[in-house]
Every structure is written in C-alpha cells, then in structure tokens.
UniProtKB/Swiss-Prot annotation:
Originating gene: NEUROD4
Region (Disordered): 1-79
Species name: Gallus gallus (Chicken)
Ranges for region Leucine-zipper: 162-183
Record's subcellular location: Nucleus
Lineage: Eukaryota, Metazoa, Chordata, Craniata, Vertebrata
Biased composition (Basic and acidic residues): 25-35
GO biological process: amacrine cell differentiation; axon development; camera-type eye development; positive regulation of cell differentiation; positive regulation of transcription by RNA polymerase II
Annotated protein name in UniProt: Neurogenic differentiation factor 4
Record keywords, A-Z: Activator, Developmental protein, Differentiation, DNA-binding, Neurogenesis, Nucleus, Phosphoprotein, Transcription, Transcription regulation
Length: 330
C-alpha cells in the first residue's frame, strides 16, 4: 500500500512540472506574437517615416525644376590661364597706345595748318578742335561773302568760343593787334564811351615788346592806355586824331660834368636858352618831338604861369659882358 501511495504522489508531481513547462512555452509564444504585431506607437512612427520620404522626393523634384545658374563658371586658376590673361592685357595696352599716338600725330598736323601755329605755346586738344571748326567756318564765310580775311569779323569768327590765351595767340599770329578786340569788348561793357572811342581809330605799336604768345594780357592793356587817352583828349578838344607817336629811341643822356682838368657837357638845345614864359606860350617843334608829344597836344593843355618872387632884370648881352670882365679882373 505504501508503494502505490508513493507512486501516485510522484506521478502528481510529474504532471505538475509538465504543466508548468507548457505554461512557460505558451507565454514565450505570446510574447513573440505581441512583438510581431505593430502597436499604436509603431504605426505613428511608420507614418512619420513615410511622410519624410515623400517630402524629400518633392524637394528633389523642385530642385530639378529651378533654372540653372547663368554666367561663366569659376574655373581653377592655372599658370597657363595666367599667362593667357597677361598676354591679352599686353596686347590691349599696345593697341590703346598705338591709337593714342595716332590721335596725337593727327592733332599735331592739324595744329601746323592752323593760322596760329606756335612751337612754344601748344594748344590743347579741345582748343585745337574748336579753332579748326572756327577756321573752316571763317573760310567758308570768306568764300561766300568775298570779304578779306584780315578784318575784324574774321578774327571774331576765329576767336568765338575760345579761351583768352588762345584768342591772344590768334591775334598775335595774324598780326592784327589785340587792341581792336579789346576796344570792341570795352564798347560792350561801357556804352557811354562808345561815341568817343568808335569815332577815332588809332594805331599804337610798341617796338621791342613781346608778342601775345609770350606776353600777358596786362602788358597789352598797359600799352593800350596811352593811345586811348590821347584819342579821348583829341575828341574833347576838337583836334585831328591822325597823329602817331614816334618809336621809342632810348632815354636822353643827362649832361655830364667831371670835376678835374677837363669837363664834358652835352650841347644844349637853343630852345633852352629862352625864358620860361616864351617857351610856355610858344613851344618849339624840337622840344615837343624830343619828348614824344605832338604839338597839338601841347596847345590843348591849359597854360599856367609860375609867379617869381624875386625881381629879375634882363640885361642885354653887350652890357653884361664888360661888367663880368671887370669883376674877374679885380
């Protein structure tokens, strides 16, 4: 009886252990099945991955639709390319240099055919072109109207639109004298003196003075003042204005006196021996010509007699001679 009891007890334990093993195996299978089935979070992750892939595909399509970048593509700078660039630059510089040399030579040839060519005063490019235009215009007017190219209108055409130094150069080279141009400008500025200046034409030449290319405008204005003053005085006093000033012959030498055994004295003019009243009332031609003033200008100046305080008695020469000899003999 005891054996059976023990066998039955062992059998029950064996059955219990087998059931426990079956339960364990079934639990493992359930875990595998649960891992194989996607949960709710797994579905959300899968949807996000699909959305990201779709967006990447759309971006790739958009990149393909954009226009390509224009312009030269940047290439790597090599020694060969640098040499080509340098050679191209040298050729361009040589071409520009040749062009400028040709332009300068053409302008020099144009300056030589102009009426006021000067080696010392070189006209600028713009002044050369303006003078050439005025020269062509003036020559065409001369051919059409038949006027001489030595009048004032010809000079006005040449100097139109030019600077003052260029106008002086033109007037000096044409030997027309800048005083006529100055008078015309002065008439425009001062219309009150128009009648006095325009009614008298004067020619005043100053020998030994520089020509307009080498002199300044102030020197020409300075030389214009004496004839203008003379013409105005002539007009006011009613004297004929056809008198010209003689050329300057140098300053008069003063009388020399050397204290010693001999003395040198310049021969005086016979007019100097005459009294002052006689000279003032009746000036001689020699004195007026020696000082460079015409006689009519001396007559036009008002006369003033200088009073002498001391008493002056005039003795005849035949009486003064014996008296002086008697004084020296004593």
């Amino acid at each position: 009886m005891t054996k059976t009891y023990t066998k039955a007890k062992e059998m029950a334990e064996l059955v219990g252990t087998q059931g426990w093993m079956d339960d364990a195996l079934s639990s493992k299978d359930e875990l595998k099945a649960e891992n194989g089935r996607p949960g709710p979070f797994g579905l959300v992750a899968g949807l996000n991955e699909e959305h990201d892939s779709i967006e990447e595909e759309e971006e790739e399509e958009d990149d393909g639709e954009k226009p390509k970048r224009r312009g030269p593509k940047k290439k790597k700078m090599t020694k060969a390319r640098l040499e080509r660039f340098r050679a191209r630059r040298v050729k361009a510089n040589a071409r520009e240099r040749t062009r400028m040399h040709g332009l300068n030579d053409a302008l020099d040839n144009l300056r030589r055919v102009m009426p006021c060519y000067s080696k010392t005063q070189k006209l600028s490019k713009i002044e050369t072109l303006r003078l050439a235009r005025n020269y062509i215009w003036a020559l065409s007017e001369v051919l059409e109207t038949g006027q001489t190219p030595e009048g004032k209108s010809f000079v006005e055409m040449l100097c139109k639109g030019l600077s003052q130094p260029t106008s002086n150069l033109v007037a000096g080279c044409l030997q027309l004298g800048p005083q006529t141009l100055f008078l015309e400008k002065h008439e425009e500025k001062t219309p009150g003196c128009e009648s006095a200046i325009s009614s008298h034409s004067f020619t005043y030449q100053s020998p030994g003075l520089p020509s307009p290319p080498y002199g300044s405008m102030e020197t020409h204005l300075l030389h214009l003042k004496p004839p203008a003053f003379k013409s105005l005085v002539d007009a006011s006093f009613g004297n004929p204005p056809d008198c010209t000033t003689p050329p300057y012959e140098g300053p008069l030498t003063p009388p020399l006196s050397i204290s010693g055994n001999f003395s040198l004295k310049q021969d005086g003019s016979p007019d100097l021996d005459k009294p002052y009243a006689f000279m003032a009332h009746y000036p001689s031609v020699s004195l007026a010509g020696a000082h460079g003033h015409p006689t009519h200008f001396q007559n036009a100046v008002p006369r003033y007699e200088i009073p002498i305080d001391m008493s002056y008695e005039s003795y005849p020469h035949h009486v003064a001679g014996p008296q002086l000899n008697a004084i020296f003999n004593e």
